[in-house]
Amino acid sequence: MRPHDADSNDLSALDPAMIDRVIAQARVDGVLLEIETEQEWIEDKGIPFIVRWITSLVSKDAARARAAGEKRAGFNPFLPPDPKLIIGDLGPDHRVVLNKYPVIQRHLLMVTRRFEPQTAALHESDFRALALTLARLGGLGFYNGGSEAGASQPHKHLQWIPATPGGAGLTRFTDRLSAAPLLEPHHRSGLPWRHAFVRHAGPLGVNAEQLQQAFLLACEATGLPPAADPMPPYNLLADSQWLLVVPRSREQHEGISVNALGYASSLFVRRPEQIDLVRRIGPLDLLTAVAT
């Protein structure tokens, strides 16, 4: 299934104007609790990493509310989602929802309409949702496969953030792979953790079949069983050209949590004093410590 074959109803949830209208109304209604951060750049072996931390008291309260909600037994914020956070349906199996506690503006979630565990294998419909999003909006899609990979909710959800100057992205890692063939796994020298990059997009752009094929190739290259139930922990990241898979061993190292965006050179700490800890450990060693 190629993006231009999609029903127009599928794409209405990915209309930037619609997204911005829902964001604006969610702010007015007080249901969008944006977390304000400051940031610092840390370079490690020539690779720049952006490290964000919470700054305002309001944002700290929002972060505490998020943590409390995540710990409520049986609480599922996606079944159903807050209607004021819903952008719209994305095919028969997914809906597009605003992240209630965004660190990055316009952070979207592609949530399954029926419950599936976050550790379940990814299906054709998941890659369809991801391909439609990347084809329409560009940016970066990602998936935290289980709590050890940084997932905060057990209900299956892919995520998307827009491309911004100096923001999270794969280009800092794929710059050396520019001549790599299509649909072949590649290892990027200088990255000490197990991983596989696969170029998935050809002249016709992003499509679900090639995105899924790229994922299967990356799983084979990294030793992940793509149809396991449950899947071992892993991170998936994809932009309009590349897909990256990183198997994971644990969610945090020395109190610093890492999700998929860490492998897009973007880290988040809760307290500014943890910046020095990231600097002491080194971003590359931090990412290696939580990988396999």
Language-model features: locations:
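Short, surface-exposed, charged/polar-biased interaction segments
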Residues: 117, 132, 148-151, 288
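Short, well-ordered alpha-helical segments in soluble proteins
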Residues: 134-138, 162, 181
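Catalytic micro-motifs at enzyme active sites that drive phosphoryl/nucleotidyl and oxygen chemistry
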Residues: 84-85, 95-100, 130, 141-150
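A short glycine-rich, hydrophobically flanked beta-strand micro-motif that places a catalytic Asp/Glu
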Residues: 139-152, 227-239
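Histidine-centered divalent-metal-coordination microenvironment in nucleic-acid enzymes
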Residues: 112, 146-171
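Intrinsically disordered, low-complexity linker/loop segments enriched in Gly/Pro
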Residues: 114-136, 142
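Active-site microenvironments that recognize anionic phosphate/pyrophosphate groups
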Residues: 1-122, 165-210, 216-292
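Generic beta-strand structural signal
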Residues: 92-94, 106-107, 137-143, 154-158
